[in-house]
């Protein structure tokens, strides 16, 4: 990773105009109250406004209601007093504080974020902290301390305070255990990311080094053997990718109904996942159809790992032949930014669909241009449908600290789900966490510029991007089938499926994890 990139990044963060920064942070939570030690009031979440701008992404708006606060929430206020002692209880506006410096804005952002996160957790019915035993109270306190250390360290890193960040990292490393609680484990991954980011911080004026970038479509293109093994385990044990495959195939089968010549363009070939699981399922479903015979199925794989994709193609060809399906498999060795319509051979008789599983977010850059060009190129192919699955979280915000805390919330939910699925000392879980999810986290936390590929965004943001490229959303009406799929595949209790504005969203205890959407030209 280029030190120059970090010099530029941190210069932008530190040199922001304070008054503008104050306006930005105040706009994040315009109605956010002070946490009170009250037993009769709390705060509940409202849906996101459709009128939020792109720069200010997916932040929570709050409104007041009269309910009972759990005991642990009152304890949170006392344990976290240090995070809120700088807030004036008579005035919540950041702009009213005169001449704030950058660190003051960081601190205010942190305070407001913790307030919203605390009340969101307080509103969840899944946790009954009123019945916590003494030892559980102790673990809650330890977890709270770990959260405080993580955010304080992220603040120090954002402010280029290397000495303070190093002290905090030393304490974090002794408390964030790979085989500890779910939050200790996810904290260990964020500690790795913060450590890497800290080592890349250079003086603001140092622009001597350039970035040594390698052409990649996603982080799996440069995966180690350990990461590839971990990715297979993620596919087998977590429902995230399988859910995307199931919903996508259901949409594709509907688009292929009554057609004889079929063509699928797969962007990224499911990150190079071995054996082509998604297309085996599609081929089997097409072979099982008795109403209409498929005369030809074409699959065009877009990717850079040619050897890996060729193996998948050979296996799929044999599989399809055994089921009586004529399959033509081809590869386009390009990344999505360089892909042109002429690279994909489309026959007039064919029904074309485009499939993207956890791929398009890798094309999102600081500017809109790269992704918009890719989407317009796809639109020019006139596919019957474009189906995409993406992580449903805002990890591409303009400020490091906000991005850090959004990803901390998201991956905490994933690690909590792993906690429910696998035993504490299970080596498979450790491999998934430390060799796959940790790599995603480190990419979000430590990388900038073209090396930051895990730029996950919320459904609303994708809706705006797709609309600008000329696509129209096609609602997915299969919540019942998706829930039946969860039961059929023995997916761990705690996973939820909801329809949200035409998309199908898989979540963990209502926290969105993956969203699948369908688009037409």
Curated annotation (Swiss-Prot):
Ranges where the record places region Leucine repeat II (LRII): 311-343
Region (VHIID): 231-301
A cellular component annotation (GO) from this entry: nucleus
Domain GRAS: 137-520
Region of interest called SAW, as start-end residue ranges on this chain: 446-520
GO biological process, alphabetically ordered: regulation of DNA-templated transcription; response to symbiotic fungus
Keyword list, A-Z: Nucleus, Transcription, Transcription regulation
Region (PFYRE): 352-443
Sequence motif VHIID, location on chain: 262-266
Molecular function GO labels: DNA-binding transcription factor activity; sequence-specific DNA binding
Result of knocking out the encoding gene: Reduced intraradical colonization by arbuscular mycorrhiza (AM)-fungi (e.g. Glomus versiforme) upon symbiosis in roots.
Residue numbers spanned by region Leucine repeat I (LRI): 144-212
Family named by the database record: Belongs to the GRAS family.
Role: Transcription factor acting as a regulator of arbuscular mycorrhiza (AM)-related genes (e.g. STR). Required for the morphogenesis of arbuscules upon symbiosis with AM fungi (e.g. Glomus versiforme). Also involved in restricting mycorrhizal colonization of the root meristem.
Subunit field text: Interacts with RAM1. Interacts with NSP2.
The protein's name: GRAS family protein RAD1
GN (gene name): RAD1
